[in-house]
């Protein structure tokens, strides 16, 4: 039986109470999920930027943002407003069309990837059944935008940054996909909902991180490289390339890169939470909660409670990983480009391939533990 709150059904029933037909209620509902995704992504970025600035300040024995709101919580909003009102400059010798299209091509696939992120049994924008395949396909578009931005800027530093970004993304996309395929192999499904449901039954012991520790490590390393986080921020290494492919950008175009980078980091953390850490699952079974409250399992209060707990659990697990990513920024040195490519092609790719083959063997030998 499926537990949790079905937002679409509840919203349609609410509108029907005002005399609207099912078709009109469905049409009104259609744009709302994407609006919710945009709001959630932007709020997530604001929280992450504030956390990074405060944690970075603590690592350097500084105070960090302090004056814009309590504890500086409004500083990310102030930064966004500053970029919003800055002049949008296009270099005289740049390719204007590609220069403008580059940031859009970087941001849009990342936002669309949020469509497959579930926060509960029914709290999913689009359960297409091939969510993992859709995410891998969308993530392969981003390097085109990065390379396009570097080329269109007509700047040697931008071009080098774009080439580095494309090489880095391609190098780490393959082991990333292979580590996810091991999860798909155990689940027999490309649906993120099925992957989370497969991790239920024994609480924390059901999580895929215990059956896929190598895949978890490979996925997280590759995700950090895809997000261009230290120690993998070579495309925009300030000491070498000024700001890489972002060098000639200003105003909102620069903000789109900034936004895309942080949305991608949060998305990667959410996917790790879903694929390896049980997603919205929490230790106490829903049946026990309903029995304790003396309510039926499908009571509205139980549905709201399980939906709320599911969202909180998913986000908490994701932000634990974001916290680790921020700490890595101040505890690891930047690698060289040859070291980065060697790590991707000579180590992570063979390890992810071996992990996939071992998973297939374990599935045949122990189907009760590794999927049937």
Swiss-Prot record:
Keyword Plastid: no
Catalytic activity: a plastoquinone + NADH + (n+1) H(+)(in) = a plastoquinol + NAD(+) + n H(+)(out); a plastoquinone + NADPH + (n+1) H(+)(in) = a plastoquinol + NADP(+) + n H(+)(out)
Any one Gene Ontology BP term: aerobic respiration
InterPro entries: NADH_UbQ_OxRdtase_su1/FPO, NADH_UbQ_OxRdtase_su1_CS
Transmembrane segments: 27-47, 97-117, 128-148, 176-196, 204-224, 266-286, 308-328, 347-367
Subcellular location: Cellular thylakoid membrane
UniProt xrefs under PROSITE patterns: COMPLEX1_ND1_1, COMPLEX1_ND1_2
UniProt keyword annotations, A-Z: Membrane, NAD, NADP, Plastoquinone, Quinone, Thylakoid, Translocase, Transmembrane, Transmembrane helix
GO CC terms: plasma membrane-derived thylakoid membrane
GO molecular function: NADH dehydrogenase activity; oxidoreductase activity, acting on NAD(P)H, quinone or similar compound as acceptor; quinone binding
Membrane topology: Multi-pass membrane protein
EC number: 7.1.1.-
Function: NDH-1 shuttles electrons from an unknown electron donor, via FMN and iron-sulfur (Fe-S) centers, to quinones in the respiratory and/or the photosynthetic chain. The immediate electron acceptor for the enzyme in this species is believed to be plastoquinone. Couples the redox reaction to proton translocation, and thus conserves the redox energy in a proton gradient.
UniProt cross-references to HAMAP family, sorted A to Z: NDH1_NuoH
UniProt similarity note: Belongs to the complex I subunit 1 family.
Subunit details: NDH-1 is composed of at least 11 different subunits.
Protein name according to UniProt: NAD(P)H-quinone oxidoreductase subunit 1
Organism: Prochlorococcus marinus (strain MIT 9301)
Gene: ndhA
